[in-house]
A protein has these predicted regions:
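Sec-dependent bacterial lipoprotein signal peptides
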Residues: 1-20
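Basic side chains
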Residues: 3-4, 24, 71, 304, ...
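Intrinsically disordered, low-complexity segments enriched in small/polar residues
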Residues: 9, 14, 46, 51, ...
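Bacterial Sec-dependent N-terminal signal peptides
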Residues: 16-58, 305
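C-terminal, surface-exposed recognition/capping segments
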Residues: 32, 39-41, 54, 74-78, ...
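A short glycine-rich, aromatic-capped structural motif
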Residues: 54-148, 173-174, 178-184
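Intrinsically disordered, low-complexity coil segments
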Residues: 63, 166-167
Length: 308
């Protein structure tokens, strides 16, 4: 069975698909599970990540819905056509992204917009696409199309089975720009629920805290964007933050064609949204975060998925 047929079949068999989401009113989950399904239900009493790599903590993305983040950034190996999540939240591939190609047997984690591997009608839709022409990434050749309706399979998480992420298509998705903006700006106490950090003295990025956050004992956290060193965690301290529900977006840099830059200096994460000929994204660097950024779609940015 081809990936395209499998994705279409999964979209039609709604009753048989697992759906897990955070329920905002009581912070529990609604779960529909087919018989003999091994994917765990959400347990709000437990934090960290479950067996398919979904955070047990919940994050509001509008006034009524919450989501659960994946355990790490999305990664891809072209030689085996395999998708996975980074083993650690602070992990990124770095300069090896310059080796991007259809035959590359290493891993990449910087992708052009909409490059799930589904033939969306764009000239560049494969994960290894490295064209530097922004219009090559327009879904069906139209700059206005995004990951909705008949084009939902352009979303990396919807179209692909992710090993150690449930290993089945249709379980994950990319946040919209509006959802990212809600996380950073519109949640209750939003300004206190994120901050820059350095992990193990070398990994720079932004920490996002869940709605119901309780700081672990003997650990300090300062919200805001006053430099990478505003929060410094050892690996042991970060493990405790992670177990309490914290999410970390590493400053993984960017790629243009085969040129990689700004590793550990900037983080740029695609959303599913468009703005005219641009793709919307969140961007951050030392002392600044912009959840309303836009950029040409040919650039390779990070992808962080949430459970559908």
């Amino acid at each position: 069975m081809t990936k395209k047929f499998l994705a279409l079949a999964l979209g039609a068999m709604l009753v048989g698909i697992l759906f897990v989401s955070c329920e905002k009113e009581n912070n529990t989950a609604n779960t529909i599970v087919e018989q003999n399904d091994s994917i765990p239900a959400h347990n709000p009493e437990t934090m960290g990540f479950d067996s398919i790599g979904a955070s047990m903590a919940c994050f509001s993305v509008d006034d009524f819905r919450q989501v659960r983040f994946s355990r790490g950034n999305l990664q891809y190996q072209a030689s085996t056509d395999t998708w996975r999540f980074a083993e650690h939240q602070y992990e990124c591939i770095g300069n090896a992204n310059a080796n991007i190609s259809a035959a590359y047997n290493g891993w990449i984690d910087l992708f052009g917009w909409g490059t799930s591997g589904w033939n969306s009608g764009a000239n560049a839709y494969q994960p290894w696409s490295s064209s530097i022409t922004a219009s090559d990434y327009y879904i069906a050749g139209d700059e206005n199309n995004s990951f909705t309706g008949s084009y939902v399979n352009a979303d990396w998480g919807v179209y692909n089975a992710i090993v150690q992420g449930g290993n089945r298509a249709g379980l994950w998705r990319t946040l919209t720009a509006e959802e990212w903006q809600y996380i950073f700006s519109h949640r209750d106490n939003a300004e206190q629920l994120y901050g820059f950090a350095t992990i193990d003295g070398k990994y720079h990025g932004v920490v996002i805290l869940p709605d119901n956050w309780a700081l672990p004992e003997n650990i300090c956290f300062t919200s805001g964007t006053q430099g990478w060193t505003i929060n410094q965690f050892s690996l042991e301290q970060w493990a405790r933050m992670e177990e309490a529900g914290a999410i970390f977006l590493p400053a993984a840099g960017l790629r243009n064609g085969n040129f990689v830059s700004k590793i550990n200096e900037e983080g740029l994460y695609w959303t599913s949204s468009t703005y005219y000929n641009f793709g919307k994204n969140i961007s951050f660097r030392e002392n600044m975060i912009n959840p309303r950024n836009v950029h040409e779609r040919n650039y390779g940015f990070s992808v962080r998925l949430v459970l559908r």
